[in-house]
Amino acid sequence: MAKGRVAERSQMGADHTTPVGDGAAGTRGPAAPGSRDYQKEKSWAEAGSARMSLLILVSIFLSAAFVMFLVYKNFPQLSEEERVNMKVPRDMDDAKALGKVLSKYKDTFYVQVLVAYFATYIFLQTFAIPGSIFLSILSGFLYPFPLALFLVCLCSGLGASFCYMLSYLVGRPVVYKYLTEKAVKWSQQVERHREHLINYIIFLRITPFLPNWFINITSPVINVPLKVFFIGTFLGVAPPSFVAIKAGTTLHQPTTAGEAVSWNSIFILMILAVLSILPAIFQKKLKQKFE
């Protein structure tokens, strides 16, 4: 008899249970794919993911900016005029003014100047802030050519790799939302050159076909390995850096950025770009021939 009562109560509970999606009870089940509610839920989820990514990115940026502040505070005591010139150069005049300040303290405070240059360059590259080209020019003014070239290549490789990792961690929603079409096109190009990807990245770094910031933030999304990305960037920025460093040796002269880069330099860059992609072309031709 007790069993009969339990069964009866269970049946009564079942009769009063509100089905999933019953509007009278105010509950809703998961929306069907393709429905308007499903699209709204998907949009809300994407917006929430984008907001969280932006919050993380801002936090990382503020932390990096604080590190830059500490680097600046560790710099030698500067006069008022020198402090005005201690800024990221936006043109050749700014680069010359900053070069004069740094060259004054370089011999006495060699490590501090080198660390400040290194940190600033990587900071700009990591967050895709314009101005690194003038720091490349400035390196030719401050340091011997071999050190300047190695320093610029290393800073470019590390900064671009940090940008890559930022995109991998928090930048995917931005790429998916705003750069989908361009990322898909570049993904197709990467797949064509997957067997010789280092040569392809070197070629892209030498040539102006794709902006560097676009390469940095989309590479992790389309599965370019970080090791290949770093090596290709380190080697690929060397030819343009060669031109910029050479221009830095004339920084004391009254020149503009356009005058500092000659047509001979541009011609050399074009030749190096072609040479960087030739191994991939020959490999593809040989493969087609033997197949």
From Swiss-Prot:
Q: What does the UniProt keyword field contain? A: Autophagy, Endoplasmic reticulum, Lipid transport, Membrane, Neurogenesis, Phosphoprotein, Transmembrane, Transmembrane helix, Transport
Q: Transmembrane region positions?
A: 52-72, 109-129, 147-169, 197-217, 225-245, 262-282
Its subcellular locations are:
Endoplasmic reticulum membrane; Endomembrane system
From the UniProt entry, list the residue stretches annotated as the region VTT domain. Answer: 140-251
Molecular-function GO term, any one: phospholipid scramblase activity
Which InterPro entries does the entry link to?
TM41A/B, VTT_dom
- The SS bond pairs are none
Biological process annotations from GO = autophagosome assembly; nervous system development
Q: Which domain of life is it from?
A: Eukaryota
The UniProt regions of compositional bias labelled Low complexity, in chain numbering, are: 21-34
Q: Name one Pfam family in it.
A: VTT_dom
Region listing for Disordered, in residue ranges: 1-38
- The reply on keyword Transferase is no
Query: What topology does it adopt in the membrane?
Result: Multi-pass membrane protein
Q: Name one GO cellular component term.
A: mitochondria-associated endoplasmic reticulum membrane contact site
| Catalytic reactions on record | a 1,2-diacyl-sn-glycero-3-phospho-L-serine(in) = a 1,2-diacyl-sn-glycero-3-phospho-L-serine(out); cholesterol(in) = cholesterol(out); a 1,2-diacyl-sn-glycero-3-phosphocholine(in) = a 1,2-diacyl-sn-glycero-3-phosphocholine(out); a 1,2-diacyl-sn-glycero-3-phosphoethanolamine(in) = a 1,2-diacyl-sn-glycero-3-phosphoethanolamine(out)
Q: Which residues carry this modification: Phosphoserine?
A: 35
Q: PANTHER family of this UniProt entry?
A: PTHR43220, TRANSMEMBRANE PROTEIN 41B
Q: What does the comment on domains in this protein's record state?
A: The VTT domain was previously called the SNARE-assoc domain. As there is no evidence that this domain associates with SNARE proteins, it was renamed as VMP1, TMEM41, and TVP38 (VTT) domain.
**Role of this protein:** Phospholipid scramblase involved in lipid homeostasis and membrane dynamics processes. Has phospholipid scramblase activity toward cholesterol and phosphatidylserine, as well as phosphatidylethanolamine and phosphatidylcholine. Required for autophagosome formation: participates in early stages of autophagosome biogenesis at the endoplasmic reticulum (ER) membrane by reequilibrating the leaflets of the ER as lipids are extracted by ATG2 (ATG2A or ATG2B) to mediate autophagosome assembly.
Subunit composition?
A: Interacts with VMP1. Interacts with COPA, COPB1, VDAC1 and ERLIN2. Interacts with ATG2A. Interacts with SURF4.
User: Of which family is this protein a member?
Assistant: Belongs to the TMEM41 family.
Protein name in the entry: Transmembrane protein 41B
**Which gene does this sequence derive from?**
TMEM41B
